[in-house]
Amino acid sequence: LSSLGLTARAGANPMITGIAVDSREVREGTLFAALPGSRVHGAEFIQYALRMGAAAVLTDAAGAKLAAEELAGSDAALVVSGLPREALARTAALWFGGQPATMIAVTGTNGKTSVSTFVRQIWVEMGLPAVNLGTTGVEGAWAAPLAHTTPEPITLHRTLAEAAANGIT
């Protein structure tokens, strides 16, 4: 994480074996990202993540304050970021590695999945392997469902790395 400008405020210098934003996915050695949410702060799940074996916690100042007691009794490294969601995205990009060199993003209120599907289909007709992500999940060179229409950074970067590994350039 130091290559991203992130340093631990407290805890050990652990060997990270995975990253998770959902405490139910934490295993021994995982970096748990406790992000602020629209209804609940992820820091409310730090105690559970620590019990599951989290070796490090990435959160914001509010999350560190919310979970101060749990973290004080732990060897887990605590990484506090003013922009924890961005820090998680950069961490996930570094963790999963390679991504296709050519990507497009479609924004707006309506038609995003349709437009990205059309672009993928055009690229495939041109002989370019492609996938698109959207409401219908991952489509193209392989298909997979997505839990959210806008995937969390971990899911996004895992999928992009899988695309690169499957020859999507």
Regions from the PLM with identified roles:
Residues L1-R90, L94:
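N-terminal leader/targeting and accessory segments in enzymes
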Residues A87-T169:
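Phosphate-binding loop of NTP-binding sites
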